[in-house]
Amino acid sequence: MGLPWYRVHTVVLNDPGRLIAVHLMHTALVAGWAGSMALYELAVFDPSDPVLNPMWRQGMFVMPFMARLGVTDSWGGWSITGESVSNPGLWSLEGVALTHIVLSGMLFLAAIWHWVYWDLELFRDPRTGEPALDLPKIFGIHLLLSSLLCFGFGAFHVTGLFGPGMWVSDGYGVTGKVLPVAPAWGPEGFNPFNPGGVASHHIAAGTVGILAGVFHLTVRPPQRLYRALRMGNIETVLSSSISAVFFSAFITCGTMWYGSATTPIELFGPTRYQWDSGYFQQEIEKRVENAIADGAAPSEAWSRIPDKLAFYDYIGNNPAKGGLFRAGPMNKGDGVAEAWLGHPVFQDKEGRELSVRRMPAFFETFPVILVDKDGIIRADIPFRRAESKYSIEQVGVTASFYGGKLNGQVFNDAPSVKKYARKAQLGEVFEFDRTTLESDGVFRSSPRGWFTFGHANFALIFFFGHLWHGSRTIFRDVFAGIGAEVTEQVEFGAFQKLGDRSSKKQGAV
């Protein structure tokens, strides 16, 4: 037909069999990619340290989505939570990946069958014998089936009635595991961080959708509405489908970037706002203060802080710190975290306790400044030593460690104090292995950042696609023009293929 690359989809217009074929092939590609990507991630994933080397530090993209649905165990005998497992069966990471690949193969064969056997009786109007699709009826069927799935997911999978539940954790991402979730039917169900809302909203949306599906199967649209919305044109379906997809993409951008019950920090990493607001820092300090109030010594109080919680309070885990053009997982940046060194507390020779001012998210470099409890600058690492008044050496700063690997150690020499002051600027202090992965020391973003960036871009592109195809279908008669030689009343947009022979035309005299 000599079509340019951007017009090739013309071949499936008015060809229901091949329209089904290309959709089957598309679903085959999606399922095949999901299964193959999962197997690739499982091949490169290191499950040995779920606390300091979790999946989001390793750049896993598919695995977090599997885990939040309750797939956490591997045929290799390990679990994402760090436990040993035996015989996880089909409901395992490898099992789900392989079922997607098998599904992909079956869809591939179905696509070929429908491409070859495209001219089925099913696709012909029994009154006219012409190829035709009853699009409002098809809409009702799709709505009913998808709503049944939606209802089933909320009522059975998430609640644990017939399924594993979903990933549930505390507000600080320390105790997460897969649990059955009871639906939340009150105002608390609208809290985006409440897993109960996932169950209740899927049940509610599924119920409404089932009723709407039955309605669209039993009630025909009025003729004026049918014509006004071009319900007989397949491009109307394309336009409205694109709108549903871009709207969903925008919503998931928000739930991913700002965080929600469906994007737990144990699986996708912390959000940038948790660093900006000092979310984990405040919780750690609160726990330490409570422990000291109960009679614990500072070193004991800090030793009670889980490494997992301390690791969240580190700027390298902030998804906004990685540049969009720095490819690779977080571990390729600052390295593989090996140990929490502890919490450094600095003191000047006057006995004042000092803390290092933390680096804001959008700074690559930031002055190392030590302030007292009143926020007054008492020490720094100067840019120009000749003019310094508050240098570590001049002020006589020492560093004492509480908790972690260096618990109880005190550093008096200026080089060591400076080293730990620079590290404290980035949050809690950790030891990293940068040799194994040849990490370059430049921060990378987490899968949370990549997901948001990708979906925001695609949502924007699909938004314009919706406008384009919506305009084409609504204004088809305007764009096409009404030719004087057409002697038959036709629905514009119904015959758009090159070489169309079905519209009666009067030859030029």
From Swiss-Prot:
Family: Belongs to the PsbB/PsbC family. PsbB subfamily.
Disulfide-bond pairs as recorded: none
Compartments in which it is found: Plastid, Chloroplast thylakoid membrane
Primary localisation category: plastid
One annotated Gene Ontology cellular component of this protein: photosystem II
Stated name of the protein: Photosystem II CP47 reaction center protein
UniProt keyword Acyltransferase, yes or no: no
Subunit structure and binding partners: PSII is composed of 1 copy each of membrane proteins PsbA, PsbB, PsbC, PsbD, PsbE, PsbF, PsbH, PsbI, PsbJ, PsbK, PsbL, PsbM, PsbT, PsbX, PsbY, PsbZ, Psb30/Ycf12, at least 3 peripheral proteins of the oxygen-evolving complex and a large number of cofactors. It forms dimeric complexes.
Entry's cofactor comment: Binds multiple chlorophylls. PSII binds additional chlorophylls, carotenoids and specific lipids.
Transmembrane portions of the chain: 21-36, 101-115, 140-156, 203-218, 237-252, 457-472
Pfam families recorded: PSII
Physiological role: One of the components of the core complex of photosystem II (PSII). It binds chlorophyll and helps catalyze the primary light-induced photochemical processes of PSII. PSII is a light-driven water:plastoquinone oxidoreductase, using light energy to abstract electrons from H(2)O, generating O(2) and a proton gradient subsequently used for ATP formation.
One GO biological process term: photosynthetic electron transport in photosystem II
